């Protein structure tokens, strides 16, 4: 079983990686976009980490929904709605659970990807 604490660690490590690599992400975005991806993602995940004390107290579904809403409100461009949708849909698929099986996590990720497809009309 995957504990909620493991999912919190996953988001924390992801936020650290975004922060560490924000310049590289921005440089990559400059080649095809408006050179703001790293900055926007760092801003969003910095806010997620600031909200982590209250997020960590919630069940897994509410935790993922909180991450998603934060990203929707703080990350600009196309990334905010895409990442926000991923986490919102994962939260909706999670219900009020405190731990997940690998199969349940896979189903949540699939629900998140389906949400991105719907948002992007892919």
For the regions a protein language model found, what residue spans apply to each?
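N-terminal loops that bind phosphate or other acidic moieties
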Residues: 1-122
């Amino acid at each position: 079983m995957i504990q909620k604490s493991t999912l919190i660690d996953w988001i924390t490590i992801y936020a650290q990686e975004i922060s560490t690599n924000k310049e590289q992400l921005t440089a990559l975005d400059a080649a095809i976009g408006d050179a703001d991806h790293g900055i926007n993602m760092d801003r969003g995940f910095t806010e997620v980490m600031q909200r982590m004390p209250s997020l960590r107290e919630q069940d897994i579904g509410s935790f993922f929904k909180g991450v998603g809403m934060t990203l929707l409100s703080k990350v600009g461009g196309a990334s905010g709605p895409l990442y926000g949708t991923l986490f919102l849909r994962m939260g909706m698929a999670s219900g009020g659970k405190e731990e997940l099986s690998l199969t349940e996590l896979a189903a949540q990720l699939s629900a998140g990807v389906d949400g991105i497809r719907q948002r992007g009309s892919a």
